[in-house]
Amino acid sequence: MEKNFLNNKTINLTSVLNGASIIGCNNEHFGRAENIIAPGKGKNMGDGWETRRSRGKNFDWLIIKFGKPGLIKKLEIDTHHFKGNYPDSCSIQTANITKNLSNQSIIKNSKIWKYILNKSKLSAHKKHIFKKFLIKRSKENYLKINIFPDGGISRIRAFGNFVK
């Protein structure tokens, strides 16, 4: 991990291999949240994050803490294996939190984080790449994915660089 920081190599900031971790989510009915930051391609639906069906204007969310602060250049939302149970759309919010806060405080305050990806359509069994749609930000160390209204995601990848 330190090598990536020193040589400014583009890496997956949301990978468990680069120190990322899940700090919370509102639902993991069918698939564990930790699966979404695992390395490699999802083996099946059970190897992704999937929430229970909901109706109305509800949405599901998950928050990832990076191993170190980074600058996101490209997002990849992979719905591989999710054909009838993928989210209709998603949005991404980020924050750079420098205070030592509890996970509960971070989750509570995530409602006001800045958007780097406004609500965008998703489709079944596909790797969705978002580069030109990203709203430019400075360094971040937390990422929140909101899925509307529910569904499954195999992997999320935020490619960028660690920054000081």
Task: Give, region by region, the residue ranges found by the protein language model.
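Trp- and acidic/polar-enriched beta-sheet ligand-binding modules for extracellular glycan
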Residues: M1-W61, L71, F82-K164
